[in-house]
């Protein structure tokens, strides 16, 4: 083994030199230079500084504006709650630990931070899956003129919580475990060892199949079918400038959604699976740290893609921030945009509203 394993940690550094120390007790500057920890702390501070206001404002604006409290928007609120979990219970601990060069809060808080970071990340992931399914049902109409109501929205939110808990809770009860990862300043599931006492192998396979491959397939299928539907509607109305504009806007939004998903999860899943399938191989601490923080950044760019680029949400936010007046003069334009005459596909339905 080219790393050092303890009771509740795994350090990607051999202890042949005697330098390796518990990441709960000593700075880990033998893994990376101190300036890298400072950069990490500054980056987490940036995510907190921007991510908290954006996600909190989403919830506040929805309370202020009744027209936003629609079934199709419930999952967006769930996404904001998921991001706040990551910001409040994950990013804050990681920032302070990075300032000290190790996870200063101990093994119990490592479980706490790992649980809430995983819970928030998984809630966010499955919220994107539910959003994709919602858009597919509403726009592609595979079930005919299906009316999406509050009951369906509540079921979608409950589903995201169930799936998130099915991933975040097992390490707390003995199926895998939470360990400091990367530069040892944040915690996540154990991809690093095949410790039979925790059945790590089966848990990692379960996570990769159920919590990455399945969401990947569902999101690509739903948005692929959505694009086909929009293009077919546009082709049937080639003379309509509004239809062509709607097609371009919907295509842009779908591309951004898919890119956001790929940037967030593919690096993390790929590196984690590589480490798991190459037990004992050499890898640096930053090898796992960088992909993990791509995933954490989703708390910032998911709200930008799904909420701030939504015209209805954006106008309501501007109105709230400007004390009830929208200086852009678009207060009533957020209800619906660019509907096609045949399919009733709108940018607001996709982006979502």
UniProtKB/Swiss-Prot annotation:
It is found in: Membrane; Cell projection, Cilium, Photoreceptor outer segment. Phosphorylated on some or all of the serine and threonine residues present in the C-terminal region. It comes from the Eukaryota. The chain crosses the membrane at residues 37-61, 74-96, 111-133, 153-173, 203-224, 253-274, 287-308. The record marks 113 as: Plays an important role in the conformation switch to the active conformation. Residues 1-36, 97-110, 174-202, 275-286 are extracellular. This is Rhodopsin. It comes from Petromyzon marinus (Sea lamprey). The lineage of its organism: Eukaryota, Metazoa, Chordata, Craniata, Vertebrata.
């Amino acid at each position: 083994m080219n790393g050092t394993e303890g009771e509740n940690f795994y350090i990607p550094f051999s202890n042949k030199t005697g330098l390796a120390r518990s990441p709960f007790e000593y700075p880990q500057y033998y893994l990376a230079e101190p300036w890298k920890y400072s950069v990490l702390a500054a980056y987490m501070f940036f995510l907190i500084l921007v991510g908290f206001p954006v996600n909190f404002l989403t919830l506040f604006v929805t309370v202020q504006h009744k027209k936003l409290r629609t079934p199709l928007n419930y999952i967006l609120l769930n996404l904001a709650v998921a991001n706040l979990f990551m910001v409040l219970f994950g990013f804050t601990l990681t920032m302070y630990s990075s300032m000290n060069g190790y996870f200063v809060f101990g093994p119990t808080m490592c479980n706490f931070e790992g649980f809430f970071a995983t819970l928030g990340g998984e809630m966010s992931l499955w919220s994107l899956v539910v959003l994709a399914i919602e858009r597919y049902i509403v726009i592609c109409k595979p079930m005919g003129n299906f009316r999406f109501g509050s009951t369906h929205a509540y079921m979608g939110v409950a589903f995201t919580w169930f799936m998130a808990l099915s991933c975040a809770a097992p390490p707390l009860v003995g199926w895998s475990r939470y360990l400091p990862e990367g530069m040892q300043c944040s915690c996540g599931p154990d991809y690093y060892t095949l410790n039979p006492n925790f059945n790590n192998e089966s848990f990692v396979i379960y996570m990769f199949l159920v919590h990455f491959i399945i969401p990947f397939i569902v999101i690509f299928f739903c948005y692929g079918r959505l694009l086909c539907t929009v293009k077919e509607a546009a082709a049937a109305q080639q003379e309509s400038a509004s239809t062509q504009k709607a097609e371009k806007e919907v295509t842009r939004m779908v591309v951004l959604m898919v890119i956001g998903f790929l940037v967030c999860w593919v690096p993390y899943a790929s590196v984690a699976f590589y480490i798991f399938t190459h037990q004992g191989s050499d890898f640096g601490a930053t090898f796992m740290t960088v992909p993990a923080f791509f995933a954490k950044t989703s708390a910032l760019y998911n709200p930008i893609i799904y909420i701030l680029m939504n015209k209805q949400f954006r106008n309501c936010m501007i109105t709230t921030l400007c004390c009830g007046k929208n200086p852009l003069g678009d207060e009533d334009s957020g209800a619906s945009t660019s509907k096609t005459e045949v399919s009733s596909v709108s940018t607001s339905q996709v982006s979502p509203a």
